[in-house]
C-alpha cells in the first residue's frame, strides 16, 4: 500500500481517539477552554450521561466572528505561538486539537460573542468535511458549545460507552477535581434537566472549606491540616488529612500550576511524610504546587494527565519537607532541622550511642501495686482509659503490650498512634534527641505520668508472663522474639530488672554493622533519577580532589560544573534524604578531618528510613555473633520502677 497523507476527517477521528474517550473527556476539554478564556461562571447541562447532549455555557471573553470557523480547525489555537511559549505553558489547552476532534465525532454548535461585537455568531459542524456554516445568533458575552449525539458516526465507539449513570459519575468526579482548584469560578451541573451540583465562588477560607466539604466530606474538611509554604520559586498549598481522622477518604488530588495530574513521585512523597507517623497507606490530600513553568513539561501525555519535572528529586524533597513540617506543627512535634545533628562530629555520633544509667526494680512493690489496682471499682479503672480530645487529636497515650504482632488485651491504642510517640520516632530517625539517660527515661515517664495506675498494672502482669525473654547477662541465640511494648520496644528480663530495647535502635545498629562490613571494599552508589544541583562554595573543588578516595568508598559521585555542585550518585542509605542540604554539610565535615569508618557508618545509618518489621529485626540479631548481640543488648534501658511506684503510692 502506497504512503499517502490521511484525509482531514480521518486524521481528526484518529486524534479524537486520544482526546475524546467518553463524555467526561469532552466536558474536560470544553470547560478548560472556558477557564482559559477567563470565565468566572461555567454552567454544564447534560442529557443521558452526556451521550445525547452536552451543553457548556460560560461568561468568558468569547471568540470573534472571524475566528469561529478557524476555532474548529485542527492545530488552531491562540494559546501558543512559538517554541518558547510551549516550554512555559500556563494554560490548560495548547495543542488546538480538542474542538476539531470533538466536532469530528458529534454534531457541534459553537455560539459566541465578544465585548467588541454587537451581536453573537454561531458555527455548526456535523462530523464531516462539509464547510462550517456561520450565522448570526442571540447570545450574551461569552461562549456556549453544544455537543449532540456523541459518536453518532462511529458506532463501534458508541457501543463502548457505559450506562448513563456510570458516564455521569465520571463527569461528576471530574467536576469535583476542577472545582477544588478553581475556587474563583462558579460551577453548576444539571442532568436530564435537574440541577445536581452547584459550587459557588469561594473567596475566603471559610467558603473554600464549604466547597471542600461538598467534595471530600465534612469530616475531612473539619479536621484537615492546611498547608501553605513558599520557598525558592516554588509553593505548595492545600489541605492534608489529619492523622486524627481514622476514616479513609477517597480524595487524592494534586495540581501543578492549576493542572490536575497523576504522578508517582508526588504519591511517594505524601506516603513517606505520613509514614513517619506509622499511619495511613494512602492519606487524603488536596494539594497545589506552583513553580516556574519552565521547570515542568506538561506536553508528555495525550490527555495531559502526567507531567515531567526537570528537577524531580528537588520537587519530591520540597513536597516531603513541607508535609512533614505541617504534620509536625499540627502535633506539636520538633522539626528535623531543630534537632541536633549527629554528623557534626564523630564525638556526637559516639554520644548518640551512649548507654543509660541502671535502675533497680522492686518485684514485691510491683506485685503489690497490681493488687491495689485490681481492687479498684470497674468504673474507676474505665476512667483511666485514653479518650479523644474535642479537637480530634489524642489527648493521652496508652502503653500497649503485645506478644509478637498481637495487641495486649488491656490496650487498643499504642504509642505508635500518638503525636508524642511520633516525636520520638522522628528524633530517632534523624539520629538525635533523647540521647542521654535523663532524656530517654523522662520521655517514657512523661508519657505514662497520667496513667501510672494502668502502667503499673501492665508491668506487674509482665512479671507473671513466662514469654518475657530472660537474657541472664547475655543475649543467647535461638531465643523467641520477646513481647512488644507499644510496637516500638522489646521487653527483656535481666536478673531482677525489666529492660526496654528500642526496635529502631536495634535496626539502626544492624544497619551500622552492615555498612561497616561493606565499607572496606566500597559502597555501590545509585544514580539519581534527576541529578541534584547546589550552589558550590569556592573550596569545594579542593575538597573533592583531596577526599576523592573517601567519596568513592561511600558511593558518592559529585562534580562541580558552572559553579554548581552536581550530585549524581549516592549510597542507597541516603536516597530518601534531603541531598541538597545533607551533602554540603558532609563536605564541610570532611574538610576538617577524615572521619573514622565507625563514625561514617553511624552518619549514614541515621538517614535510613523504613526499617524492617520487628520479627525480621529480631531474626537478624539472632544471626549475629555473641559479641555483636551483646552490644545491642547493652543499649537496652532499665525501667525506673521504684520511682514510678513511689509516685503511685503518694
From Swiss-Prot:
<comment type="similarity">
    <text>Belongs to the DNA mismatch repair MutL/HexB family.</text>
</comment>
<dbReference type="InterPro" id="IPR013507">
    <property type="entry name" value="DNA_mismatch_S5_2-like"/>
</dbReference>
<dbReference type="InterPro" id="IPR014762">
    <property type="entry name" value="DNA_mismatch_repair_CS"/>
</dbReference>
<feature type="region of interest" description="Disordered">
    <location>
        <begin position="374"/>
        <end position="420"/>
    </location>
</feature>
<dbReference type="InterPro" id="IPR042120">
    <property type="entry name" value="MutL_C_dimsub"/>
</dbReference>
<protein>
    <recommendedName>
        <fullName>DNA mismatch repair protein MutL</fullName>
    </recommendedName>
</protein>
<dbReference type="InterPro" id="IPR014790">
    <property type="entry name" value="MutL_C"/>
</dbReference>
<dbReference type="GO" id="GO:0030983">
    <property type="term" value="F:mismatched DNA binding"/>
</dbReference>
<dbReference type="GO" id="GO:0032300">
    <property type="term" value="C:mismatch repair complex"/>
</dbReference>
<dbReference type="InterPro" id="IPR020667">
    <property type="entry name" value="DNA_mismatch_repair_MutL"/>
</dbReference>
<dbReference type="GO" id="GO:0005524">
    <property type="term" value="F:ATP binding"/>
</dbReference>
<comment type="function">
    <text>This protein is involved in the repair of mismatches in DNA. It is required for dam-dependent methyl-directed DNA mismatch repair. May act as a 'molecular matchmaker', a protein that promotes the formation of a stable complex between two or more DNA-binding proteins in an ATP-dependent manner without itself being part of a final effector complex.</text>
</comment>
<dbReference type="GO" id="GO:0016887">
    <property type="term" value="F:ATP hydrolysis activity"/>
</dbReference>
<dbReference type="InterPro" id="IPR038973">
    <property type="entry name" value="MutL/Mlh/Pms-like"/>
</dbReference>
<feature type="compositionally biased region" description="Polar residues">
    <location>
        <begin position="392"/>
        <end position="420"/>
    </location>
</feature>
<dbReference type="GO" id="GO:0006298">
    <property type="term" value="P:mismatch repair"/>
</dbReference>
<dbReference type="Pfam" id="PF01119">
    <property type="entry name" value="DNA_mis_repair"/>
</dbReference>
<keyword id="KW-0234">DNA repair</keyword>
<dbReference type="InterPro" id="IPR036890">
    <property type="entry name" value="HATPase_C_sf"/>
</dbReference>
<dbReference type="InterPro" id="IPR014721">
    <property type="entry name" value="Ribsml_uS5_D2-typ_fold_subgr"/>
</dbReference>
<dbReference type="GO" id="GO:0140664">
    <property type="term" value="F:ATP-dependent DNA damage sensor activity"/>
</dbReference>
<keyword id="KW-0227">DNA damage</keyword>
<dbReference type="Pfam" id="PF13589">
    <property type="entry name" value="HATPase_c_3"/>
</dbReference>
<dbReference type="InterPro" id="IPR037198">
    <property type="entry name" value="MutL_C_sf"/>
</dbReference>
<dbReference type="InterPro" id="IPR020568">
    <property type="entry name" value="Ribosomal_Su5_D2-typ_SF"/>
</dbReference>
<dbReference type="InterPro" id="IPR002099">
    <property type="entry name" value="MutL/Mlh/PMS"/>
</dbReference>
<dbReference type="InterPro" id="IPR042121">
    <property type="entry name" value="MutL_C_regsub"/>
</dbReference>
<dbReference type="Pfam" id="PF08676">
    <property type="entry name" value="MutL_C"/>
</dbReference>
